[in-house]
C-alpha cells in the first residue's frame, strides 16, 4: 500500500530534493557569471555579503546593546530589571529570525562564490597532515543540495565517497559571514586536523580564519582557535571546554564564544553511538570505598564458581535427557536454568545451535512467564543468582544470600534492604516513643538502608563484572589498567571508565589496582550539549534508519541526497551457518578465493577478539593481511586508504576508518571492485550499512555479504524464530549454508527489535538528564552572570529582598522580635532594631521593607569603607565560591539518588517520576542554600586590611580544585541505564490506576510557604516564580 502511495505522490526524499532544485539552479546561474571576475573582485563580493548581513542586523543589535547598558545601572529596581530582561529575550528572538532571513537571501550567491573559489583552486599543491595534496574538487549539484540541507538545520545523508568534507564548507562559509563562529565536529583529533588543513585554502582565499581544537592544547591556544570564523574539533573537546568554562574563576579563563551553528560530521556516531556516555569532569574524593570491593571480591569469586558448577550439572542433566529422549520439559527447564544462570557458557551456546533446542527453551520459558511471570521465581530459586543478559540485570536469590552469609559469617538479613517507608510508618505509629526516640530510630533506619544498599550495589556490580563483562571483548587489561573497548569501533578508549562502581568491580575481578572513587564536578550528556547551539546540522552516510530518533531527540530532519553516479555495488543475501567454527572456516576460504583473483577484501568484525581469531587463522595459511583494532587514528586512516589495492586483505572493526575513502587500485575494477565481508551482523542495521558503504564509492563496482552463525550474539539473544524454524524444518546439518532473502529480512527484523530497545534506553537516559539539565541551565546562567557582570550589587539586593520577606514571615506570626534580630545579626552582621509594638502593628510587607532598607544602608556604608575594585571582588567571590561548592555537593547527592532509584520499580513506582520529585526537592533546597550563603558572605566579608585581602585571594585559590587533579572523561553511564532496564521490566501497566497513583504521589506543600521571587515556580514551568505565577 505504501509503495502505491509513493508512486502516486512521490516519496519524502523526492519532495525534499524537488523543493531545493530551484535554489541549485539559481546557484549555478550566478556561478556561471563569476568566472569573468578577478580574484580581488571575487573577494569584494564576499566583503559585500558581510556588509549586507551587518546592515540587516544593525538596528536590532543597537537596541540590544542599549538595553544591556541599562542593566548595568546600579539604581535599577527589581521590576525594571525584569522588564529589561524580557525585552532582551524578545530582541534575541528577533535577531535570530532576521539572521536566518538574510542568510537565506544571500545563500545562492554565497554558494556560487564558494564553487567558483574551488574552481580557481584546481591544481593547487599543498600539504595536509604531512601528505602532499593537489586540489581537484569543485562541488557537484548533489553536493550543493547537501550544503543547502546542512544550512537548513537538517541531516544530509550522503553515500561514502560523495565528498561530505567539501559539502561542509558551503554552509560553514555562509554562516561564518555573521562573525559568530561555526563549529565543525568530527569523531577524532586526526580527522579534525586533516579536514581543517584540507579545506583551509577555500576559507583563506576570502580571509576567513580557520582553527582546530586538539586534546593537547592549552587554554590560551584554545581561546585563539575559538575566535576563528570556523573551528574544527571533536565532540569531546567542545563539550569539555563548555564544562571547564563553567568552572572558570575569571572572565579571562573563558575560551568559548556563545554557541551559534555546528555541523556534525558522522552525525550518527556522535549523536547516537556516543549518546549513552555523558561527558564528566571529576576530581578526587577524600574517602573511597575501594576497600569494600577488595573485601567482598573473594566471596563473589567463590559464589560465581559455585554457580558455574551448578550450571554445569544442569547442562549435563539436560544433555543426558535429550540423548535418552526423556521428558523434553525437564530438559528444557534445566537448559532454561543454564540460560538464567550463565548465558555465556560456551557448552550451552553449542547446545543452543542444535535443531529444536532454542524452541524448546522458549516454550518452557513461556510457560513460566504466564500470569505476569509469577512462576519465574521457581526457575531462579535453584540458582545462586539470575542473569538477564538482554537488560543487563542480575538478581541475588535467597540461596545466594545464604551462601554469602555463610562465607561472611554474618546473618543473611545483612543482604536485605529494609523498606524505609514501611519502617518509618511503624515508628510514627508507635505512641510509647518520645519525639527524640522517634528521630533516633528513623536515623538508624536510614543508616541501615544506606549501608545495606551500598553493600548490595557492590555485590551486584561484581556479579556483573564476572557474568556480563569479558576480557578482550568489552575491555582489555594493559599495563595494569582496565581499559574499555568501544563496542562500535573496536578501539580502546583511554581515560574512559564505567560508572557506578562497575569499573572498580572489574578492576577487583582482574586483581589490578583499584582506582579511587571520583566526585563529579561538572557533567552534561552529548544530547544536551548539542541542544545549546542555535542551529545544528549533520552529515553521514547512514542516518535514515535512525531518522525517528534524530527528529524526536534533536528535532533534526533527515534528507537523503542522491549520489552523483549510480551505485554499482552488489549486496548479496546473508550466508547463515550453524556454528562460529563453520563460519570462520568459510570466511578464510572466501578470502583465499578472492585473493587468488586479485580482488581486495575488507573483513568487518564486531570485536577485537574476532579480528584476532581470523588473523591467527590467516597467518596459519600464510596469507598476508592487515589488522585494524585499537590503533592510532593516523595508522588507521593509512591502512584503510590502501585497502582497495589489488589482492589486499584487511581485517577491521565495523566502523574503522570512517572519514577515509577506500580508493581502488590499478586493475581492481576489472576484478569486481572492493569485496566487503561482514563476519557477523551488528545490533544496529546502521553499522552494517556503514560497512557495506565502504565499497561502491562514486560509481565504483563492489560486492558485500554477511556471514552469520546461530552462535553470534545477535542471533543468540534476539534471533528470529523464523530463522530457527526454517533451519529446523530443512534439517540443517553441520557445514550447510542457508542463503535466502527471507532469512536476511528475518535477521534485519531482529536488528530492528534491538534498535528499538537501545533507542528506548537512550531516550530514558535523556529523560533522566533533562531533569538535571534544567537545573544546570539555571546554575550556569547565574554563574556566568556573576563571572562577566561588572557589578553584582543589584543581584545581591534582589536576594536580600527575598530573604527579608522570608525572615519576617517566619517571625511575624509570633511577634518574636528577639529571634528576628538575632538571626539577622548572625546571617548578615546587620544590627536590626524594631519595637515589638511596631512589629506587631506593621504588615509583613512593611516590616520586610524596613529590614530591607536597614540592610541596604549597612551595605552602602560598607561600600564607602572598601575600595570599589575590592568590593566587586568580594561580590564575585561570594557568588562564585558558594555556587561552585553547593553545585558539587548537589551533583553528589543527585548521583546517590540515581544509583538506587531503579529499585523503586520493584515497589510498582515509576523510577523517573520518583527521581524528578527527589531532584526537584534537592534543587529547591540548593537554591535556598546558595542564596542565603551568598548573601551572608557578601555582607560579612570585610577585607579592610592587606592581610584580609590576601586571605580572600588565598580562599579563592583554595576553592578551585587544582586543575592538574581534574579528570575529563566520557563515562559509560550504568545507573540510569539500569533504571531504564528495571523500568522496562517492572513498570506498572498504564491501565492500572493504583500503580499510576503510586508512581506520581507528590510531596505535600505547606500553604503558608510563599515561594521567593527567584525560587522555581511551584507550577512546574521551570521558570522563576517572579516570571511566572508571581507576576
Swiss-Prot record:
InterPro entries in the cross-refs: Helicase_ATP-bd, Helicase_C-like, P-loop_NTPase, SEC_C_motif, SecA, SecA_CS, SecA_DEAD, SecA_motor_DEAD
Q: Which GO terms describe its biological process?
A: intracellular protein transmembrane transport; protein import; protein targeting; protein transport by the Sec complex
This entry's Gene Ontology molecular function terms read: ATP binding; metal ion binding; protein-exporting ATPase activity
**CDD domains documented for this protein:** DEXDc_SecA, SF2_C_secA
Renumbered residue ranges of the record's region Disordered? 963-1031
Q: Which reaction does it catalyse?
A: ATP + H2O + cellular proteinSide 1 = ADP + phosphate + cellular proteinSide 2
Compartmental location? Cell inner membrane; Cytoplasm
* Binding annotation for ATP: 143, 161-165, 661
UniProt cross-references to PROSITE patterns, sorted A to Z: SECA (PS01312), SECA_MOTOR_DEAD (PS51196)
Q: Cofactors per UniProt? A: Zn(2+)
Q: Which GO terms describe its cellular component?
A: cell envelope Sec protein transport complex; cytosol; plasma membrane
The free-text note explaining how the cofactor binds reads:
May bind 1 zinc ion per subunit.
Per UniProt, Zn(2+) binds at 1017, 1019, 1028-1029
> Its Enzyme Commission number?
7.4.2.8
Write down the Pfam families for this protein, in alphabetical order: P-loop_SecA, SEC-C, SecA_DEAD, SecA_PP_bind, SecA_SW
Top enzyme class of this protein? translocase
Assembly and binders: Monomer and homodimer. Part of the essential Sec protein translocation apparatus which comprises SecA, SecYEG and auxiliary proteins SecDF. Other proteins may also be involved.
According to its UniProt record, which protein family does this protein belong to?
Answer: Belongs to the SecA family.
What's this protein's function?
A: Part of the Sec protein translocase complex. Interacts with the SecYEG preprotein conducting channel. Has a central role in coupling the hydrolysis of ATP to the transfer of proteins into and across the cell membrane, serving as an ATP-driven molecular motor driving the stepwise translocation of polypeptide chains across the membrane.
Q: Which HAMAP family match?
A: SecA
- Identify this protein by name: Protein translocase subunit SecA
Show the taxonomic lineage. Answer: Bacteria, Pseudomonadati, Chlorobiota, Chlorobiia, Chlorobiales
Amino acid at each position: 500500500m505504501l509503495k502505491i502511495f509513493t508512486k502516486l505522490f512521490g516519496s519524502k526524499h523526492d519532495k525534499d530534493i524537488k523543493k531545493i532544485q530551484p535554489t541549485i539552479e539559481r546557484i549555478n546561474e550566478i556561478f556561471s557569471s563569476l568566472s569573468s571576475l578577478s580574484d580581488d573582485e571575487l573577494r569584494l563580493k564576499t566583503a559585500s555579503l558581510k556588509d549586507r548581513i551587518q546592515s540587516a542586523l544593525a538596528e536590532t543589535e543597537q537596541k540590544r546593546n542599549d538595553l544591556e547598558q541599562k542593566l548595568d545601572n546600579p539604581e535599577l529596581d527589581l521590576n525594571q530589571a525584569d522588564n529589561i530582561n524580557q525585552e532582551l529575550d524578545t530582541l534575541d528572538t528577533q535577531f535570530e529570525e532576521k539572521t536566518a532571513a538574510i542568510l537565506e537571501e544571500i545563500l545562492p550567491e554565497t554558494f556560487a562564490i564558494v564553487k567558483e573559489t574551488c574552481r580557481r583552486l584546481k591544481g593547487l599543491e599543498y600539504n595536509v597532515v604531512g601528505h602532499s595534496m593537489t586540489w581537484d574538487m569543485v562541488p557537484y549539484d548533489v553536493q550543493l543540495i547537501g550544503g543547502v540541507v546542512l544550512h537548513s538545520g537538517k541531516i544530509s545523508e550522503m553515500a561514502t565517497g560523495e565528498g561530505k568534507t567539501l559539502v561542509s564548507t558551503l554552509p560553514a562559509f555562509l554562516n561564518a559571514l555573521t562573525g559568530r563562529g561555526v563549529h565543525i565536529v568530527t569523531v577524532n583529533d586526526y580527522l579534525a586536523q586533516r579536514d581543517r588543513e584540507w579545506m583551509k585554502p577555500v576559507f583563506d582565499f576570502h580571509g576567513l580564519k580557520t582553527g582546530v581544537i586538539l586534546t593537547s592544547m592549552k587554554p590560551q591556544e584554545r581561546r585563539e582557535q575559538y575566535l576563528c570564523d570556523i573551528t574544527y574539533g571533536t565532540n569531546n573537546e567542545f563539550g569539555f571546554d563548555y564544562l571547564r568554562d563553567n568552572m572558570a574563576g575569571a572572565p579571562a579563563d573563558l575560551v568559548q564564544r556563545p554557541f551559534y551553528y555546528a555541523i556534525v560530521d558522522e552525525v550518527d556516531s556522535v549523536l547516537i553511538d556516543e549518546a549513552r556516555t555523558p561527558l564528566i569532569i571529576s576530581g578526587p574524593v577524600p574517602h573511597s570505598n575501594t576497600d569494600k570491593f577488595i573485601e567482598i571480591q573473594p566471596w563473589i569469586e567463590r559464589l560465581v564458581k559455585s554457580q558455574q558448577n551448578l550450571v554445569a550439572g544442569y547442562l549435563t542433566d539436560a544433555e543426558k535427557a535429550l540423548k535418552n529422549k526423556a521428558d523434553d520439559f525437564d530438559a528444557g527447564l534445566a537448559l532454561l536454568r543454564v540460560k538464567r544462570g550463565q548465558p555465556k557458557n560456551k557448552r550451552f551456546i553449542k547446545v543452543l545451535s542444535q535443531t529444536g533446542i532454542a524452541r524448546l527453551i522458549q516454550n518452557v520459558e513461556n510457560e513460566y512467564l504466564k500470569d505476569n511471570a509469577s512462576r519465574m521465581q521457581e526457575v531462579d530459586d535453584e540458582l545462586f543468582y539470575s542473569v538477564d543478559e538482554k537488560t543487563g540485570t542480575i538478581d541475588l536469590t535467597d540461596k545466594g544470600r545464604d551462601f554469602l552469609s555463610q562465607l561472611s559469617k554474618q546473618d543473611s538479613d545483612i543482604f536485605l534492604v529494609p523498606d524505609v517507608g514501611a519502617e518509618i510508618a511503624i515508628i510514627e505509629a508507635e505512641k510509647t516513643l518520645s519525639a527524640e526516640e522517634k528521630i533516633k530510630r528513623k536515623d538508624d533506619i536510614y543508616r541501615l538502608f544506606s549501608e545495606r544498599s551500598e553493600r548490595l550495589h557492590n555485590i551486584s556490580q561484581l556479579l556483573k563484572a564476572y557474568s556480563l563483562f569479558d576480557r578482550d571483548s568489552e575491555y582489555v587489561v594493559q599495563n595494569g589498567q582496565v581499559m574499555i573497548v568501544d563496542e562500535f569501533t573496536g578501539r580502546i578508549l583511554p581515560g574512559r571508565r564505567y560508572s557506578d562502581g562497575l569499573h572498580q568491580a572489574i578492576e577487583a575481578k582482574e586483581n589490578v589496582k583499584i582506582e579511587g572513587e571520583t566526585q563529579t564536578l561538572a557533567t552534561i550528556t552529548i544530547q544536551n550539549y548539542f541542544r545549546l547551539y542555535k542551529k545544528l546540522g549533520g552529515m553521514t552516510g547512514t542516518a535514515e534508519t535512525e531518522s525517528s530518533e534524530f527528529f524526536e531527540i534533536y528535532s533534526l530532519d533527515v534528507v537523503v541526497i542522491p549520489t552523483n553516479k549510480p551505485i554499482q555495488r552488489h549486496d548479496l543475501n546473508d550466508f547463515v551457518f550453524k556454528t562460529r567454527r563453520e563460519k570462520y572456516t568459510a570466511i578464510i576460504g572466501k578470502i583465499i578465493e578472492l585473493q587468488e583473483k586479485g580482488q581486495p577484501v575488507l573483513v568487518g568484525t564486531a570485536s577485537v577478539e574476532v579480528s584476532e581469531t581470523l588473523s591467527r587463522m590467516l597467518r596459519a595459511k600464510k596469507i598476508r593481511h592487515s589488522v585494524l583494532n585499537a590503533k592510532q587514528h593516523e595508522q588507521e586512516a593509512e591502512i584503510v586508504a590502501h585497502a582497495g589495492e589489488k589482492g589486499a586483505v584487511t581485517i577491521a572493526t565495523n566502523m574503522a576508518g570512517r572519514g577515509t575513502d577506500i580508493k581502488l587500485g590499478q586493475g581492481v575494477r576489472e576484478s569486481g571492485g572492493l569485496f566487503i565481508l561482514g563476519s557477523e551482523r551488528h545490533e544496529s542495521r546502521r553499522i552494517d550499512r556503514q560497512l557495506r558503504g565502504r565499497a561502491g564509492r562514486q560509481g565504483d563496482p563492489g560486492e558485500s555479504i554477511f556471514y552469520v552463525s546461530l552462535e553470534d550474539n545477535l542471533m543468540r539473544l534476539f534471533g528470529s524464530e523464523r530463522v530457527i524454524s526454517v533451519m529446523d524444518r530443512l534439517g540443517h546439518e553441520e557445514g550447510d549454508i542457508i542463503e535466502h532473502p527471507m532469512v536476511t529480512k528475518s535477521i534485519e527484523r531482529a536488528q530492528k527489535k534491538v534498535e528499538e530497545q537501545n533507542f528506548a534506553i537512550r531516550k530514558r537516559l535523556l529523560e533522566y538528564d533533562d531533569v538535571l539539565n534544567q537545573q544546570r541551565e539555571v546554575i550556569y546562567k547565574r554563574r556566568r552572570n556573576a563571572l562577566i557582570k561588572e557589578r553584582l550589587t543589584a543581584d545581591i539586593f534582589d536576594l536580600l529582598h527575598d530573604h527579608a520577606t522570608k525572615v519576617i514571615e517566619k517571625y511575624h506570626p509570633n511577634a518574636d522580635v528577639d529571634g528576628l534580630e538575632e538571626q539577622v545579626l548572625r546571617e548578615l552582621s546587620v544590627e536590626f532594631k524594631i519595637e515589638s509594638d511596631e512589629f506587631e502593628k506593621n504588615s509583613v510587607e512593611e516590616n520586610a521593607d524596613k529590614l530591607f532598607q536597614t540592610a541596604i544602608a549597612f551595605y552602602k556604608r560598607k561600600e564607602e569603607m572598601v575600595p570599589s575594585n575590592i568590593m566587586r571582588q568580594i561580590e564575585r567571590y561570594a557568588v562564585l565560591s558558594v555556587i561552585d561548592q553547593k553545585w558539587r555537593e548537589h551533583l553528589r547527592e543527585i548521583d546517590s539518588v540515581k544509583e538506587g532509584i531503579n529499585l523503586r520499580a520493584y515497589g510498582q513506582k515509576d523510577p523517573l517520576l520518583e527521581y524528578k520529585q527527589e531532584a526537584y526537592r534537592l534543587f529547591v533546597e540548593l537554591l535556598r542554600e546558595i542564596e542565603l550563603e551568598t548573601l551572608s558572605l557578601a555582607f560579612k566579608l570585610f577585607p579592610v586590611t592587606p592581610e584580609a585581602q590576601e586571605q580572600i585571594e588565598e580562599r579563592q585559590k583554595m576553592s578551585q580544585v587544582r586543575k592538574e587533579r581534574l579528570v575529563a572523561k566520557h563515562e559509560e553511564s550504568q545507573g540510569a541505564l539500569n533504571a531504564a532496564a528495571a523500568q522496562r521490566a517492572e513498570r506498572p501497566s498504564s491501565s492500572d490506576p493504583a500503580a499510576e497513583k503510586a508512581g506520581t504521589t507528590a510531596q505535600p506543600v505547606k500553604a503558608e510557604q510563599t515561594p521567593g521571587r527567584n525560587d522555581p515556580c511551584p507550577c512546574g514551568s521551570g521558570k522563576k516564580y517572579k516570571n511566572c505565577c508571581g507576576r
